Regions:
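Transmembrane beta-barrel domains of Gram-negative outer membranes and organellar outer membranes
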Residues: 14-261
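Sec-dependent N-terminal signal peptides
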Residues: 1-2
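N-terminal signal peptide c-region/cleavage motif recognized by signal peptidases
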Residues: 7-9
Length: 261
């Protein structure tokens, strides 16, 4: 399969490819992109026999505000398929989860020390197609990103905090009160292959529990029939999770379509 893909594609060697590779790793790059990310996790539920497939559709839309500032819209639409989380298949569901919508106001130029910054609001929208796939409440809070890119290295952090707006959510759901932290580090070589590590840690202030997967990813920048894109794959390991959450190893594969301006 891999040889078939490579036979229809060429490694990207244009002079602007290094910049394109950097932009693909920048959450607030002024570039249209469409990441589609598939995650598989296991050992969920009271018996540890449950599994979940999570496909995140994550369009990124940049808007120019003036000569100095951009507004970057980042949307995460989760499509969920879960099985075996409860006896008798009571929690077996497939459908859409809640959308997370973030807006980053970002200076067009890095700081004097080379840091790229962005900040703005994050909104949780209760779009879940089933009450088992949704928090059933709106939530709002701040989101920030800071990163630095030099000599092939990209390092930084993306974070947000969401507070539920409903003091009494339906179906006895806990009020949303969670912090998300995503520190990341990667290196891109001369063939525009990126080796990266990150965590996507969430702390639930209501239950006082962490969810912490470590992701190890390899990403390749390609052009297929003139369309620049990245393909990504790698394992993930849950070092901390609620009792009914995923345990042990999982994996991620992703493709991101890039549309340079």
């Amino acid at each position: 399969m891999a040889s078939g893909i490579l036979s229809q594609s060429t490694w990207v060697h244009a002079e602007d490819s290094a910049e394109l590779a950097k932009q693909a790793l920048n959450p607030v790059a002024a570039m249209y992109s469409l990441p589609v990310q598939y995650n598989w996790d296991q050992k969920m539920g009271p018996s540890g026999g449950g599994m979940r497939s999570l496909t995140n559709i994550q369009p990124v839309l940049p808007f120019t505000l003036n000569d100095d500032w951009n507004l970057i819209s980042r949307t995460i639409l989760p499509v969920i398929d879960q099985h075996g989380l409860a006896p008798g298949g009571a929690a077996d569901k497939s459908g859409v989860g809640d959308v997370t919508q973030s807006f980053f106001f970002s200076p067009k130029k890095p700081t004097d020390s080379g840091w790229i910054l962005g900040a703005g609001p994050a909104i949780l929208i209760p779009t879940g197609s089933d009450d088992l796939l949704s928090s059933e409440q709106w939530a709002l809070g701040p989101t920030v990103v800071a990163l630095k890119q030099s000599n092939g290295w990209t390092r930084g952090i993306l974070a947000n905090h969401l507070w539920g707006l409903d003091d009494s959510p339906p179906d006895e759901k806990d009020k949303v009160n969670s912090t998300f932290l995503q520190p990341f580090l990667s290196f891109t070589n001369s063939q525009f292959t990126t080796y990266g590590i990150n965590t996507e840690s969430t702390y639930n202030w209501q239950s006082r529990e962490w969810s912490i997967p470590i992701n190890l990813m390899v990403t390749q920048l390609l052009k297929i029939k003139g369309q620049p894109l990245t393909v990504q794959a790698g394992p993930r390991y849950w070092i901390e999770s609620p009792d009914d959450g995923p345990q042990g190893w999982g994996f991620r594969v992703a493709v991101t379509f890039l549309f340079p301006r």
